[in-house]
């Protein structure tokens, strides 16, 4: 029963503790949590710890300051790229002994001429490979709410967050994966003087892939809110604001060969290319070193900055007629050099008429309990972060045959890059009859 050998009953448990207290002038709350989850597949589990602290200060009647700090740490254990316990349990014949090794194709024979098959056992493959992901997250925020006047409020919101993750996956020298790609024979099955040993790129050690990512972001927002009723029939609401936000993502990915985790996590050097000789006597080329210098190492560094100004306006007369308007302008480091798009705001307008509140309806059409007409028109946009206002040149290594550094153009420039524009019209009617039947038309 492959499911019995490769899977289990999933089980998870969570624990949380929290404290809180305070007065009208000061309050606090703190919490901690722990979660452990064992997945359905043996070898797949997750552990997570979280924490949160929140403080509220009210030094004067009209001023409120709130601060929050969040954090979490998690670790996830999983499988190597080509290890799928559930798929193997579903598709594999039950006659096969789970502890036995059976023959698989030798993918390395084209370099050695040796077509002998390789030994394969799924449980051995699972136990001698794996993956692990670690993540650390922390965020802090500050909110200030100040009622300057009865009809005027100032709000400040600021936040900063960081998320660091480390991912690694590995396959040791005891796996079929390494034998099939880099060795051509089962581990420890040949002598150092044999032709197969001399033709192996990686006679000792396995492969380790690591990927480290660091993300940072901050957000600052200032808003002024205006809300005033001039008399029972007239009310005005308005808001002015600015927002500054930025996000940066940095990452480094790397692959090394010769990884031996059971000997102090050492790296054993692969065979020198000039010493890797096929049975025919000709070198096989750079071998693993070619992979090392050909896209196996990668670093990314990407930053997006945005500065925004926005305003909203809403006017209500007799609580029946409402008009509103919104305008927003954004600047970004991903835009081009076209001066016509440096100030290119988005905007929207809307209206609403509560017809059922009119005297005519109240007197002659009482069975129409609700009748609203509304409409909006607006332009919205998204930043095309995948495009670039500048020429992107990929500076590569040395071009074979020319023995010169070479570069390739990966993206042509778009100097007219700006927000994409989407126009929206919306009209709607809300109707209710006898306080029983309701209809909405958009």
Spell out what each predicted region is:
Residues 32, 158, 347-351:
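One face of beta-strands
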Residues 343-351, 435-440:
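A short alpha/beta connector and helix-capping loop motif
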Residues 1, 39-44, 50-139, 155-157, ...:
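Surface-exposed loop/interface segments of Gram-negative outer-membrane beta-barrel transport/assembly proteins
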Residues 1-43, 80-82, 125-128, 145-147, ...:
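Residues embedded in well-ordered regular secondary structure
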Residues 32-38, 323-335, 375-377:
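Transmembrane beta-strand segments that form the barrel wall of outer-membrane beta-barrel proteins
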Residues 17-21, 53-57, 140-146, 220-228, ...:
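Residues on the lipid-exposed face of transmembrane beta-strands in outer-membrane beta-barrel proteins
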Residues 145-150, 420-442:
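Long hydrophobic segments that form regular secondary structure
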